């Protein structure tokens, strides 16, 4: 039962930056627990990001582990212009003008990167600058000049390009800028796995980006970053359209009272869980680790509470992008997650009940309950798009989920989904064959062992998304050997280990012949056999030639077969893959 105890359910998103741009650091943070790597398109050039993408893909290949790449678009962040001396200091009571005119900033005025400033911001509106460090109120508006004449209510320092927020004011600004469109096309061309849209306000913003992605022929899922009050007011409609959510607590805490953010975080997580879409909790989770090797106790509690709330993933920003301890930050987050999850399993915490009636929902919920009742080592899902795995995940089963898919992009995307370990397995003609191949891969990766119980779920209509309607329980059997298969399909039977023709004098019809090599003395036994296993490797050996002539499946080149396989044991031969299993394994 090693898998159930060791697999961390909560995923970790790490932001790539100067501190983690080398191959050695990328490898280290992935090995420490990062499952998705975020590229922040507010910084860096396309050449920088292209280099990062290539390094991530190469490192993931070397580690034999799917790693998702999340492209985070900058969005229409409203900012100040540049000051003639780089910065100014404002005091409470100072008068200050914000204008849409292109002027160089002084002690009295600064331009702002929004054209319709004077038309849409009313008198009396509160304006927050530099994440709320400076605050002012609009006293007068000059629409002809495009000026907002303000009074400073909270003083402080302002410098070039600092952000500006208008809490409670409805602006007609679009969620995607021209830069975002260029960045999106670049990201799609580079094969990113997720795209995060910043400053989402309404469902139309999501429709726009999805239509853009669709027009390129791609199917990249979109994450809605919730950081505007308008998005909160239309939460259900926004979340129903996106493929994932990010609780962007930085700007959200400026747009809304800071004390509201924890409540909104819980609401967003609960809604995303119910809808079965992954949710990331982000911003300042381990912020002190930018410069310190250990987090504060409050930060540990913040990460822990997000996990207890039900977040799929927790995110590191500056901690891994520019921090002094990026690997330690990832490892710390992984340790917190493992400890909290251990406590959750021990205390049998609540599991989601989805009131929407559907066959996939009922199957997905039942799979978790069956796995827990039977003490299964894993739940195994066959999925073409990731939908089956996500559906099982939303019910938060205590048993780990192995998501079997033939598509590498789906495997990467599932690295953002709670409790899911993706396995890349080539699609085979039948569901049973694909499950058996997946069990083999899981055994090779030490995720499953002989005797483990696995609860399987899939759709009987292979390749059709959303058709989950099958539950199957199976015991993992050992792979006794591997060689080269000659023939078709799979056969099961009782092993008859023979070193000479005399050893098969009482050979029964349907038995499987196991021998170092065969000769003319074995022909009568071969006529009765359902299969042949030999240690001899040649494809033109006696067993291979006679087996093909008589239509008997053969696996040649199975090393030490006569030593490993016990006489009288039940075996299954998977001829297509050249595998010999212990026990009768169904591969319909």
Annotate each PLM feature:
Residues 16-18, 34, 41-44, 73-76, ...:
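Short, ordered loop/turn segments at secondary-structure junctions
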Residues 11-13, 36-38, 66-70, 95, ...:
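Structural preference for beta-strand elements that scaffold enzyme active sites
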Residues 6, 14-18, 169-283, 289-300, ...:
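Conserved alpha/beta-domain cores
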Residues 94-95, 236, 269-273, 280, ...:
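ATP-dependent carboxylate/acyl-activation modules
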Residues 47-50, 55-63, 67, 107-135, ...:
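Phosphate-interacting basic helix/loop segments used at nucleotide- and nucleic-acid interfaces
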Residues 1-18, 22-23, 30, 45-50, ...:
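Expand to "…catalyze enediolate/carbanion chemistry for C-C bond making/breaking, isomerization
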Residues 76-177, 441, 447-502, 506, ...:
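Acidic, glycine-rich flexible loop/linker segments
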Residues 32-88, 188-193, 313-336, 340, ...:
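Conserved glycine-bearing catalytic or ligand-binding loops at nucleotide- and phosphate-handling centers
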């Amino acid at each position: 039962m090693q898998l159930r105890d060791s697999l961390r359910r909560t995923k970790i998103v790490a932001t790539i930056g100067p501190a983690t741009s080398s191959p050695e650091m990328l490898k280290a943070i992935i090995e420490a627990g990062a499952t998705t790597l975020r590229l922040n398109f507010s910084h860096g050039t396309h050449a920088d990001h292209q280099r990062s993408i290539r390094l991530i893909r190469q490192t993931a290949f070397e580690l034999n582990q799917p790693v998702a790449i999340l492209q985070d678009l900058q969005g229409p962040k409203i900012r100040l212009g540049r000051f003639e001396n780089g910065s100014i200091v404002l005091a409470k009571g100072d008068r200050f003008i914000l204008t849409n005119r292109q002027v160089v900033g002084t002690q009295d005025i600064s331009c702002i990167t929004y054209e319709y400033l004077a038309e849409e911001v009313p008198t009396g509106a509160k304006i927050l600058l530099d994440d709320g460090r400076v605050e002012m109120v609009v006293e007068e508006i000059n629409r002809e000049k495009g000026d907002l004449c303000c009074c400073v209510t909270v003083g402080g320092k302002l410098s070039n390009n600092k952000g500006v927020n208008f809490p409670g004011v409805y602006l007609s600004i679009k969620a995607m800028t021209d830069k975002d469109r260029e960045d999106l096309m670049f990201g799609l061309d580079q094969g990113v796995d997720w795209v995060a849209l910043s400053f989402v306000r309404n469902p139309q913003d999501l429709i726009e980006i999805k239509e853009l992605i669709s027009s390129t022929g791609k199917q990249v899922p979109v994450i809605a970053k919730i950081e505007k009050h308008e998005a909160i007011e239309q939460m259900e409609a926004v979340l129903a359209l996106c493929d994932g959510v990010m609780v962007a607590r930085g700007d959200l805490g400026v747009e809304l009272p800071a004390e509201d953010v924890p409540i909104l975080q819980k609401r967003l997580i609960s809604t995303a869980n119910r809808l079965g879409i992954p949710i990331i909790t982000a911003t300042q989770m381990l912020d002190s680790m930018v410069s310190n090797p250990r987090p504060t106790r409050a930060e540990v509690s913040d990460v822990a509470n997000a996990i207890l709330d039900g977040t799929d993933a927790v995110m590191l920003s500056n901690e891994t992008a520019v921090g002094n301890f990026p690997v330690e930050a990832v490892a710390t987050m992984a340790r917190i997650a493992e400890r909290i999850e251990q406590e959750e399993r021990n205390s049998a915490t609540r599991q989601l009940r989805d009131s929407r009636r559907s066959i996939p929902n009922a199957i997905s919920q039942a799979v978790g309950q069956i796995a827990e009742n039977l003490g299964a080592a894993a739940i195994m899902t066959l999925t073409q798009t990731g939908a089956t795995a996500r559906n099982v995940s939303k019910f938060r089963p205590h048993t780990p989920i192995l998501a079997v898919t033939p598509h590498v992009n789906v495997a990467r995307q599932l690295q953002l989904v709670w409790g899911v370990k993706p396995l890349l397995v080539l699609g085979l003609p039948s569901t049973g064959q694909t499950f058996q191949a997946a069990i083999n891969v899981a055994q090779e990766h030490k995720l499953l062992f002989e005797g483990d119980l696995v609860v399987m779920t899939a759709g009987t209509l292979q390749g059709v998304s959303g058709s989950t309607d099958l539950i199957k329980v199976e015991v993992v059997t050992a792979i006794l050997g591997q060689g080269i298969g000659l023939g078709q399909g799979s056969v099961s039977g009782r092993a008859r280990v023979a070193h000479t023709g005399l050893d098969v004098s009482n050979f029964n019809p349907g038995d499987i012949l196991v021998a170092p090599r065969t000769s003319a003395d074995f022909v009568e036994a071969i006529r009765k056999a359902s299969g042949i296993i030999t240690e001899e490797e040649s494809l033109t050996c006696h067993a291979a030639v006679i087996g093909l002539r008589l239509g008997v499946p053969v696996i040649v080149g199975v090393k030490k077969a006569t030593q490993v396989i016990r006489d009288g044991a039940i075996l299954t031969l998977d001829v297509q893959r050249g595998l010999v299993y212990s026990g009768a394994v169904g591969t319909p």
